[in-house]
Amino acid sequence: MVAPRPMTRDALMSAFGGESMAHMRYSIFADIAEKEGFPNVARLFRAIAFAEKVHARNHYQRLGELDTDAKVVAGAPFGPGNTSKNLSLAIRGEEFEINEMYPTYIKIAESQGETQAVISFKWALEAEKIHAELYKKAKEYVDKGEDMPIDGYIWICPVCGFTYVGKEPPPKCPICGALGEKFVKF
């Protein structure tokens, strides 16, 4: 795969950096939630951390035959706290990706005819919408001192990061079309 044009390349590198940091942040937040007695919220953080890793991998793979050292600029909320604060940080990060980052990156990649980057950005955008809603629901419970109830499991599509809660995965991913039997269970 040939390296993308410079503006798309920069967007992919920035998105890779942001998703990589989200993966680590959510992994740390999971440990905190576990210690505070919110095992389902911890499971949610771990599942979405995996989804963010999927997004980072997809962006990285679309960089093609790039051979460069680069400084990656990626904004991220910092300052871990208790689980309620961490959920607020997670919601803020997801909403930034939904409302600003991915719509802008999609426009850049579309304007440059970078189809694979557009796909990667769109897949991540759709998954982030679900992540934000799940984090909002979790925060409502945590703010009442309760763990978020999860009926079944949290399922993550290993291709695009789509996130689903239920006893079984969907038969097919509604974002990328991957078979549900390939989903990772949390």
What positions do the PLM features span?
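Non-heme di-metal
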Residues: 1-186
